[in-house]
Curated annotation (Swiss-Prot):
HAMAP family: NusB. One of its GO terms (cellular component) is cytosol. Keywords: RNA-binding, Transcription, Transcription antitermination, Transcription regulation. GO terms for biological process: DNA-templated transcription termination; transcription antitermination. This is Transcription antitermination protein NusB. GO terms for molecular function: RNA binding. It comes from the Bacteria. Involved in transcription antitermination. Required for transcription of ribosomal RNA (rRNA) genes. Binds specifically to the boxA antiterminator sequence of the ribosomal RNA (rrn) operons. NCBIfam families: nusB (TIGR01951). It comes from Helicobacter pylori (strain P12). The gene is nusB. Belongs to the NusB family.
Amino acid sequence: MATRTQARGAVVELLYAFESGNEEIKKIASSMLEEKKIKNNQLAFALSLFNGVLERINEIDALIEPHLKDWDFKRLGSMEKAILRLGAYEIGFTPTQNPIIINECIELGKLYAEPNTPKFLNAILDSLSKKLTQKPLN
């Protein structure tokens, strides 16, 4: 059975595909997750994260942007956007504790992104979590 960490990794891959222009990913997300052995409770968890990010993507991007300081959101890599969006969604709209979310995103950054990305993700998501002290926003 897949772990929540594996489910989050699969969601990041789906979000990356979506950001890269594959809008069809929404229709086949469930079957793609099942191919990755994400099933039962973890499948429901992964789909809730994926669909939640897509439903609130503009709101999530607006939450992230003020914390980028000298960065332009549009110039971030697709993988960085995917991980930040997942982290921001979980911080803002789920009951999962912020340190757990941030740590998971750092680990995803180590796995999927450039070597300096985990520090970048940590800084942005930590800043965001401090601003959003009340959970959840929805």
